[in-house]
Every structure is written in structure tokens, then in C-alpha cells.
């Protein structure tokens, strides 16, 4: 049972990387600004915006993920499950593409197949992508790990298609789920370009077929009381650990002070032993996340869609002579 190819975003500029030598010469190497062709010529996606402009109010929660620091240990995934009462569905459900993770770690291997090579040899798109999934030879094999969760887009495609407004946007930049309003159409899951939304096919917490951690008295004692246990037929996804955000806001209000930088943390950030994940308020100009956002290595996933994510990534820097363009 493997989810590696279930939610693939192959064929797009998902992972960006460069070498240390190139990075020292040019901090933006491997992370050139993306431009779209238009009647005005080449422009950035934000210049072709069809949405109404949105401005955050008091806070603007953002997350940064450094691909150079992530080594794919999976601690963030386990922490997310424990903190947010995400059910363990087992191998049989995973084989049916019914996996349940708010956060996944995508693994990309370097490949000898490229788009240019496929075009030269007359190989079709489906066959090309199949060949791209085959790793290159052991001598030149490279791997990249990339954590992917809900990107909390500020122009979210999922929000437009929900017929009951079960997924909405907060004034702090979070994409929110209202579970008791969701009727399970799965339109949002279908319209999400990042494939991060999950559907509850069963009532996992009281189902003997899923004898893992939610259907006995002892298992229910370790559930987080601050997080709703979802029922059958509703969608769920990363909430940026909203319960921790709200608790910190209440603590700061009680003490009549502002929230300090680093005071709010997500479960994945806390569990990451390399410090690859940084979370914070981007409206605080002195915060670490604000500095990460302005870093020349920073880029957004699927920038060409102009979803304006609140999660961004930093280019992977390899300490070698030449970068492999075929990851």
C-alpha cells in the first residue's frame, strides 16, 4: 500500500533546486521569477488576477518549508495525526486511494526521461510520465522530499465550488472547514490543485473494521479534546493547528499583550528535528516568517495558477558541481 503516485503533481515546477556554487553567485539561482504569456507580453500571475483584492486584518498566518533541511523522516506526519485526531485507516483503504493524512511527504527521484527527450523520440504524455517515475541509474540517482499540506490559498479554488459554503476564508488568511455544514459533495477535493483534501468514507471513531486508535475507550482517551472528531461524509484537511492559534490569542489577550514571534506553533513545526518548517505571523515585520518570505530562495507551489498560497517553499541547495534538471 503506497500513496506515492496517488496525488502526483508531475510535469510542473514543483521542486526547485540549485548547487551551492551557483547559489553563492546568485541567491535566486534555480528560482527564476515565473512569467505568463499575455496580450501585455510576459507578466507575473498576480497581474492577471480575476479575484477581488483581499487584505488580512490583524494576523496573517504563513508557513515556510526549507527543502534543503527536509530529509523525509515523517515525524511531521505523525505529529499531525496525533495533534488533530486524524484517523489511521489501514493498508486496505490506502490501496483504494482512501488515505487519510492532512500532511504528506512527497518523494521525487531524479529520472533520465525529460520532456525534451520525449518530444524528440515521439513519446506520448502518459508514457512519458510513466518513464519519469522510473529512477535514474544508481550512480546519478538523487531524491527530494517535499512536505505538502493545505496551502491555505488566498484565492482558493476549493472555496469557489462548495455549494454550502462549508469551506471559507478567514480574515487571518486561513482556509477554514465548517464540518457540520459539509454535505460531502467532494467538489473541493476535485478542484484542489494540490490534492490535499481528504474525505471520511466511514465513521472511523466507532467502526470495528478500523481497530487502530479511535474505537475503544482507551484509544479515545488520547484524542485531543480541542479538535473536533470528524464524522462520515465530510471533508477534512490541514487547519494550521487553529486550536493552538486560538489558545495563544486568548493567552495574550488575558495578559494584555501582543502575540510574540514563535509563540504560535503547528504540530509539524514542533516535531521537525531539522527546523525545516517555520510558522508565524507575516504581518509582524520582525518575525522570522516575514524574513523567510522575502528570502530569494522562496517560491510558491504551482505559482502559475495564482492561488496565492500562505505556504511557501525554499529552493533545495545541493553541494555538488552540477544540478540535475530532471527531478
Model regions and ranges:
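Non-ligating segments of multi-cofactor redox enzymes
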Residues: 1-327
Amino acid at each position: 500500500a503506497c500513496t506515492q503516485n496517488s496525488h502526483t503533481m508531475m510535469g510542473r515546477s514543483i521542486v526547485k533546486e540549485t548547487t551551492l556554487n551557483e547559489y553563492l553567485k546568485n541567491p535566486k539561482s534555480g528560482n527564476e521569477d515565473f512569467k505568463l504569456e499575455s496580450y501585455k507580453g510576459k507578466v507575473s500571475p498576480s497581474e492577471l488576477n480575476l479575484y477581488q483584492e483581499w487584505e488580512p486584518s490583524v494576523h496573517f498566518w504563513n508557513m515556510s518549508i526549507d527543502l534543503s533541511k527536509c530529509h523525509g523522516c515523517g515525524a511531521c506526519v505523525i505529529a499531525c495525526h496525533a495533534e488533530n485526531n486524524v484517523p489511521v485507516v489501514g493498508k486496505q483503504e490506502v490501496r483504494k486511494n482512501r488515505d487519510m493524512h492532512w500532511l504528506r511527504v512527497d518523494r521525487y527521484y531524479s529520472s533520465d526521461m525529460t520532456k525534451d527527450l520525449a518530444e524528440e523520440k515521439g513519446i506520448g504524455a502518459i508514457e512519458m510520465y510513466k518513464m519519469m517515475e522510473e529512477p535514474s541509474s544508481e550512480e546519478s540517482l538523487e531524491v527530494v522530499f517535499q512536505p505538502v499540506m493545505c496551502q491555505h490559498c488566498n484565492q482558493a479554488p476549493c472555496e469557489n465550488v462548495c455549494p454550502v459554503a462549508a469551506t471559507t476564508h478567514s480574515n487571518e488568511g486561513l482556509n477554514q472547514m465548517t464540518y457540520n455544514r459539509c454535505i460531502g459533495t467532494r467538489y473541493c477535493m476535485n478542484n484542489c490543485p494540490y490534492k490535499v483534501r481528504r474525505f471520511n468514507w466511514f465513521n472511523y471513531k466507532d467502526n470495528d473494521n478500523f481497530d487502530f486508535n479511535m474505537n475503544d475507550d482507551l484509544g479515545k482517551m488520547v484524542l485531543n479534546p480541542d479538535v473536533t472528531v470528524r464524522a462520515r461524509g465530510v471533508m477534512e484537511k490541514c487547519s494550521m493547528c487553529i486550536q493552538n492559534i486560538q489558545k495563544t490569542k486568548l493567552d495574550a489577550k488575558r495578559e494584555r499583550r501582543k502575540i510574540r514571534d514563535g509563540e504560535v506553533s503547528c504540530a509539524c513545526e514542533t516535531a521537525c528535528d531539522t527546523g525545516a518548517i517555520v510558522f508565524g505571523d507575516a504581518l509582524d515585520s520582525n518575525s522570522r516568517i516575514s524574513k523567510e518570505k522575502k528570502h530569494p530562495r522562496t517560491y510558491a507551489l504551482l505559482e502559475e495558477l495564482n492561488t496565492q498560497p500562505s505556504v511557501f517553499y525554499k529552493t533545495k541547495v545541493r553541494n555538488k558541481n552540477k544540478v540535475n534538471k530532471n527531478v
